[in-house]
């Protein structure tokens, strides 16, 4: 399955080990992680070589090609929220995961849309 992994990049990289774990887990299960750059420890340096438009177009292209999204939402991020909304609009199923004691938005926790789920993990 083609998976879009969403996680905070500019909002903070504290969850990087978690993104790397999720990416590795999905790949080991035979899934293709299109947005693997989220789990790349060098992503900020690599993205500094791209324009904002190039980053947006790349990510939206990955999302368009995805069969589902996994969004790590423990770290508040406008970008992750935008990607989740974009996936919902495109009819792409979304699973949001978060660590215990995370302050997850009510916009996710209270969402009753059938193709979005929020799960505690860790």
From Swiss-Prot:
Reactions catalysed according to its record: a pyrimidine 2'-deoxyribonucleoside 5'-phosphate + H2O = a pyrimidine nucleobase + 2-deoxy-D-ribose 5-phosphate; a purine 2'-deoxyribonucleoside 5'-phosphate + H2O = a purine nucleobase + 2-deoxy-D-ribose 5-phosphate
GO molecular function terms attached to this record: 5-hydroxymethyl-dUMP N-hydrolase activity
GO BP term, pick one: deoxyribonucleoside monophosphate catabolic process
UniProt keyword list: Glycosidase, Hydrolase, Nucleotide metabolism
Signal peptide: none
UniProt cross-references to SUPFAM superfamilies, sorted A to Z: N-(deoxy)ribosyltransferase-like
InterPro entries assigned to the protein according to its UniProt record, in alphabetical order: 2'-dNMP_N-hydrolase (IPR051239), DNPH1 (IPR028607), Nucleoside_deoxyribTrfase (IPR007710)
Enzyme Commission no: 3.2.2.-
Amino-acid positions noted as binding substrate in the UniProt annotation, renumbered to this chain: 4-10, 19, 37, 83, 105-107
Pfam families, per the entry: Nuc_deoxyrib_tr
Record's keyword annotation contains Cytoplasm: no
Subunit structure: Monomer and homodimer.
Function statement: Catalyzes the cleavage of the N-glycosidic bond of deoxyribonucleoside 5'-monophosphates to yield deoxyribose 5-phosphate and a purine or pyrimidine base.
HAMAP family reported in the protein's UniProt record: Nuc_phosphate_hydrolase (MF_03036)
Full protein name: Putative 2'-deoxynucleoside 5'-phosphate N-hydrolase 1
Species the sequence originates in: Methanococcoides burtonii (strain DSM 6242 / NBRC 107633 / OCM 468 / ACE-M)
